[in-house]
Each structure stands twice: as C-alpha cells, then as structure tokens.
Amino acid sequence: MLDLKRIRTDFDTVAAKLKKRGVSEDTLTHLKELDEKRRALLVQSEELKAERNIASAAIAQAKRQKEDATQQIADMQKVSADIKTIDNQLVAIDQQVTDIITVLPNTPHDSVPVGADEEDNVEIRRWGTPRDFDFEVKAHWDLGEDLDILDWERGAKVTGARFLFYKNLGARLERALYNFMLDEHIKEGYQEIITPYMVNHDSMFGTGQYPKFKEDTFELADTNFVLIPTAEVPLTNYYRGEILDGKELPIYFTAMSPSFRSEAGSAGRDTRGLIRLHQFHKVEMVKFAKPEESYQELEKMTANAENILQKLGLPYRVISLCTGDMGFSAAKTYDVEVWIPAQNTYREISSCSNTEDFQARRAQIRYRDEADGKVKLLHTLNGSGLAVGRTVAAILENYQNEDGSVTIPEVLRPYMGGETVISPK
C-alpha cells in the first residue's frame, strides 16, 4: 500500500509513476481532495471539542454556584451534535480513502522499463542454447501420457479441468525436483518453512491479493480462510504486525507448497499441459531486507532461481518486466523464462520481485534500526524458486529422446534412487 503522506507531499512524482502503470491522475487528484477535506474536518472537530470542553467547565461552575446553565447546556448540545456530524463525515471519507488507496498498485522503480504489456518487456540475458532436435519433438503432455507418468483424464474425472495425477516416475520426478530446489536454497542461507495451506483474509490483504484480486482465489465458504495462491502469502505474513531487530536482517525463507488459483480470465489459454493449473507445487523464496539493501537482494534472489535452471541444464532467459506487465505489489520484477521446445518459445518459470515497503505497510512489518533506534518499514521480496510443474514440463521436453524416453537430469538422479531415464512401458 502506498504512503498517503507521500502522495500528499510528493503528488506530482507519485502521479507520474502511477501513470506509467495505467492509473489516471484523476484518481490521485480525488484521493488528494478527500485527504485535504479529511484533514480540514479533523481541525474543525478538534476546535469544536475544545469549545465543548470550555462549555462543560462553564456549566459545572454555574451549577456549583447555583446559577442557571440552560443556555450553556443548549450551546454544548449543539456543539456535540456538530461534532457527531463531522465524525460521521470522517468515517465516510476514511472509507473512500481506504477504497482507493488499497487498490492503487505500487510505484515502479526508476530502472523499470515503461510499457503497456509483455511486448514491452526487456530481455536482460540468456543462458544455455536450445537443443537442436533431429526428430519431431513431442509436447510434454503427450510425453507424460505416453510414459504413463501424467494422467489428465482421471484428474478431470476426479476433480475437473486443469487438474491431473502424477504417477510412477512422474511423481518421483516432481518430488525430486522440489527436494533438490529446497536443498539448493538452503545452501544459499534460506530457512526452510512448512506453511499453512490456508490463510485468513488479513494475510491476503497484507501481501496485496485482497481486496483487488479476490476472483483469482479459492475461498472456503462461511469461513475466514482462503487456499493459498502462493507460499509468498503465509511466508511474508509470518512477521505481520511485528517489529524485527535490524541486526537480524536480511532474513531468507523458502517453502514448498501447493498453490491454488482459479485462473479467472484465463479461459482458452494453456488448456493442455502443466503450464496453467488450478493446483500446482511451487518452491517459494521470500526475503525481509533493509531498504538500502533490497535491490542487491533482488539480484541475489534472481540468481538463486537461475542457479536451479543452470544445474538442471535448462536454457532460459531473464526479462525485466515493464510497468504495464508487473504484478500489483511489485516495484521491480525479473521473470525467468525457460525454453519449451514444443512451443518454440520461452515460458515463465520464476518471477522475482522487490515490493519495497508496499507489502510491509499493508502488513505492518517493521524493524528497529540499530543505527538510530528508530522503527521503520522494511522491504519484502518474493520469488519462485521454481514452479515445479513447469520445471517438469521443461525437463520432459528438453530431455526427450527419439525413442520416446526422457533422460533424467544428472543432479536429480540421487533424489530418484539412481534412475537415469524414464522409458515408455
């Protein structure tokens, strides 16, 4: 959430930054006008309360002296009525301010490319060379069925579209991947966490999913619970409402969890395969950092995601998302996209973001600066390390062989009991 004081004191800068994200200046102008009206009413309210206190003292004195206080009482009742009217106006204005400021996106960092959509994203670097196949490549969903390791038909029967069963070496490959990912992140100083798979609405607000993106989630009816769309939500909210010791920062968390997404607005997109599911496993990275260190930590986090792909031998590229393609809470985002041969393109497999103090303000996560003893908002970062199902898809397609088998990447073999290949039955 943006700082209302910042909007008030640096309006033109904030308006210019949010314009790059498609926010009309009229919206900010209305917010500023509401804030000015609210502050004026607060002054009026305080002045009237001072009058009421004086009148109350005069009434008390008149009564002690057995004097008639009828007029003073009438005057005080009028002042009290005026205060109540102003208080009601303040409640209404506060709600309007909240309704606006809670759905304003984060302001982009100055290094973020300006653009409308994914066409304006900027490629930063590539790693690896896509394999030159001398046979016709199969899509991962066909490979999964032919190898009897992925079962979409029964997933649809048991649950519905965009669900599946992993079987046999497919299940072991999925498990091997997330164990490998967690182990790699632990080597880099991340603390492994097992989170709840449900969170409350306050947690969803804290990380920015609520109130704007409710339609993308699965809520449990008649409860305060929501199935997590990503482990970012419980990991970031771990410290919600707390003040951390600045000497402890930065703090790194990692967790593997299922992610549940309604995929509202995705009808007709990626209807086959592992790219877009309602339920999928993902290894998440979350950091809590001092403001002056957060962009260095973003580079490290992105490198942590890249490390997984490099050790798996999967070609990828890193993209800096433009202002029109970034997520709601992000100030800057790098997408890491893995090569998918059957689609002849790169697809997102990790998204690493610095939200600066946007989530920390919503969730009230602060730290005490050891230098001056002051309590300040910290910066939060999050990233996929990686989306496990998409990594399975990338391995199946990039490591497929002409005979229909798939070679298991060398780094995963110790996690799979020494298996080296997944062969057709």
Curated annotation (Swiss-Prot):
Superkingdom field: Bacteria
Residues annotated for L-serine binding in this entry: T230, A231, E232, E284, S384
Cellular compartments annotated: Cytoplasm
Entries under InterPro entries matching the protein: aa-tRNA-synt_IIb, aa-tRNA-synth_II, aa-tRNA-synth_II/BPL/LPL, Ser-tRNA-ligase_type_1, Ser-tRNA-synth_1_N, SerRS_1_N_sf, SerRS_core, tRNA-bd_arm
NCBIfam families tied to this protein: serS (TIGR00414)
Similarity comment: family membership: Belongs to the class-II aminoacyl-tRNA synthetase family. Type-1 seryl-tRNA synthetase subfamily.
Function: Catalyzes the attachment of serine to tRNA(Ser). Is also able to aminoacylate tRNA(Sec) with serine, to form the misacylated tRNA L-seryl-tRNA(Sec), which will be further converted into selenocysteinyl-tRNA(Sec).
Recorded domain comment: Consists of two distinct domains, a catalytic core and a N-terminal extension that is involved in tRNA binding.
Descriptive protein name: Serine--tRNA ligase
Provenance organism: Streptococcus pyogenes serotype M49 (strain NZ131)
